[in-house]
Amino acid sequence: MARELMPKSGIMMPHVVVTRDAAVVGVSTVDGQAGAIDLTGKYLQKTDAAATYQTKTEGASKDFVLDSIQPIMSGALFREDPWVVNDTPFRSTGANGVESVDMMKVTPDNSIKIGSYASSVQGVEIHSAGRLQVVDQNDSGVETKYPVYSKRYRPEIEDLPFAAIGSYVKDSKGRTIGVNRTGINSDIKQLTQKVTFTQPVTVPDAVGDYDAVTLRQLRNSGGGSGGPTMSGISNFGIGDFHLRDSRAFIPAFEVVSDGQLLNRADYPDLWAYAQLLSPIEDSEWVSNVYQRGKYSKGNGTTTFRVPDRNGVQSGSIQGLFGRGDAGSSGSNGVVSDSGAPNITYSSPHTMVTLASASGQVATNGAIQSITSTDDVAPVGTGGKYISTNFDASRSSAVYGRSLSEVVPRNFIGVWTIRAHGGFTAANTSWSVINSDASEQPTGTPITGGLVSSKYVVGGVDKYRSSIQLLGSNEVDLSTRITTINDRYAIGAATWDFKLDGKLLFNKSLTPKGTGESPGNTYLTLANTWMSAAYSGYIGFVGGGVGVSNGGWRNFISLGSLIFPDSSHPTAVISQVYDYDLSTGSQPNGDIVRNTYFSAESYDITFGNNSGTTNYIFSKSPVSDERLKHSIKEEGTATALSNLNKMEYKTFIYNYDEKATVRRGFIAQQLEAIDPQYVRKYKTFKGTDTLALDENVLLLDAIAAIQELTKKVEVLEAKLAEK
């Protein structure tokens, strides 16, 4: 009988052995014969299933399967033009009852998405013993590879420190790594969730209120090594406690340690300190008297509770004193009741009982009666009851002084806690110090301790000012005074007093009219208001230059001169030659040169301190017709006549040590000709000094030339007639 099989099943099989325990799909017997059948050289075949979803009892050819999968793969990940929406995912059956998982798909913005929230993907694993590279291509087509190393490939990877952009760090093998792009491990500001660091994170000293502080700053703030020291007051930091003499006087910056609730808003510094100690829940504090040496969280929002070291609260253990924790910080804040080692006593075979009856020996306190099983003398031989007492005070008067607790020698006060940073003390001085154990490299940024003053509204800083030492080690140093408006984010104004003596201002003023100069000046000195009319000089700013041994010195001062009484002050630049260093005064008053800027006459004059005005700087008078009235013609003959009256003389100035003979006119004589030819000035001595008015003289000289010109023209005309 032929054994060529052509049943329903159908997957091509070059060699199949069918046993009683394994049958070809759809075949139970072959020509009615069961058992082992050798199908070598035979095959089974079946047409492709027509249904869209095939059942287990149906089969499919290899071509059918490939033709079915290919469109799905192409549509999911490799869709080509003209298709645009590439959002069909490549899915897989999920585990643990999840129907399906979106493993990978191409999104409309041309990125590859792995997993999805809707599919409950719990994570993506990348298995690599080497490195994973992220390849970026810029606009010019240049590719840059950014590797992500596994610890197996780079075991030192966990030792890499955090670093700022543009800096260079070294890994544990000494290799230099340049940081030139922002990332999670180079910009801590990008961390939006709670992160636990397993290695120390190096940061600079905090500057702003919300900056992370360094260990050095934390130690300094608590008064540790190198911390703040103050003369004239207790050098306790916030949270430190000590024993005050009496409740009759508790300083304003302290609170008693009575286990009371405090408002967090009223004691922000102490609450900040309490949080460093991990305060417990208030319910635990109240229910467990042995936890009352700790801070509690109060109501959890607005209050907190201080330790009850004075034993004031109901049920608290009283009369507490402190002791060290023996190196176990877990015991900190735990309260202990009175305790002492037990005292035992025994005296065998010294008490006699009758008939071995119990209770025949009287006992008191710590003494207990125990009946021995040993025989004693027979009855009637003179045995007696013996009673005994134990009284420790008979050996030392220490015993019995306290009825309920073991008490060492002590005195009683009241425990208090430093709650505020403010203080008041006479003759107080203090230091605010930042310190390093060793010299820092040249150029390292350094800051001294910060002294800060604030005005706070509703718990938020509004205005603040500070003074702080800052600079770069061995390069630059200054003391900075800062004033800032935090609420409205107005830029800080700072004054830097440099180590080389310079004073720098960092903030510019807005230009305004000169009439507003009293309120719009970088450096404004105190106003000098006299209670009565006064004459004298006030120097605003000045400084000396010269030789320290006494010669060639000059002190230059800008100030104001009031003279005479009841007159407007005049701006003056004063130069004091060869002044005395110890007193700052000029022993020879004549060697002083003053330049005056008159606010009334607009004149600039120069003279010495003896009252002599030597020069008056000329100025150009305004001659605009629009500023004049009553304009009339005036003959030039008067000008020529006046010039002819002037007596041209020689003279020597009184102050001129060289006695130089000069030529010119005498002001008093010109004043007699025409008062407009001279100007009068008051000296320091109150006398008038006359000076020639060059402007009037020049104009009259021009008029005289015009008069002479007319006379020449008349004479020329007469000569022409002859």
UniProtKB/Swiss-Prot annotation:
<keyword id="KW-1227">Viral tail protein</keyword>
<keyword id="KW-0426">Late protein</keyword>
<protein>
    <recommendedName>
        <fullName>Probable tail fiber protein</fullName>
    </recommendedName>
</protein>
<keyword id="KW-0946">Virion</keyword>
<keyword id="KW-1230">Viral tail fiber protein</keyword>
<feature type="domain" description="Peptidase S74">
    <location>
        <begin position="623"/>
        <end position="719"/>
    </location>
</feature>
<dbReference type="Pfam" id="PF13884">
    <property type="entry name" value="Peptidase_S74"/>
</dbReference>
<dbReference type="GO" id="GO:0098024">
    <property type="term" value="C:virus tail, fiber"/>
</dbReference>
<comment type="function">
    <text>Probable tail fiber protein.</text>
</comment>
<dbReference type="InterPro" id="IPR030392">
    <property type="entry name" value="S74_ICA"/>
</dbReference>
